[in-house]
Amino acid sequence: MRNGYTPSKNKPEYWEGGKIPWFRMEDIRQNGRILSDSIQHITMDGVKNGNLFKANSFILATTATIGEHALVIADSLANQQFTNLSVRKSLKDRIIIKFLFHYMFIIDDWCKNNVNISGFASVDMNKFKKLEIPIPPIEEQNRIVAILDRFESLTTSLQHGLPAEIAARRQQYEYYRDKLLDFKRKTA
């Protein structure tokens, strides 16, 4: 777990010609919750001690818009609104990153309910560090991911979701039409 930061804007060498993604809340709002690139970039000169956030880690807003998160699939940095979360090396073979992506929505809610207000709102990081994440077997993680990815696709994709919804409504219409208009002839 590491905090994000903003390299000095007064040092053009930190920004000009930068290729390293530097994430802000605007990136999530414009590009969604799985990010490979950012709107703004920095140079390696702007990176403290040369330590980037590793690919396949998460950025989680722990101040301001608390609980917003994204899976970042490229080495990067983020501003101070975000805390970077990555999987420990000892757990990498036991965790599917997309499972954690979906579980982050649970963590988002937890963060919103565990806030310190001292000058400005922020997540209670002492409690956060003690937060336990359940890790089901890989097979169960795969099953959960498959189900949640399908629902996500249906709810977020006009290309997939809307046609599926139309097909479901058409099927529902046909069912009720057939039931409502199926008059059995009475024989006398």
Protein language model annotation of sequence segments:
Residues M1-A188:
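Charged, alpha-helix-forming regions
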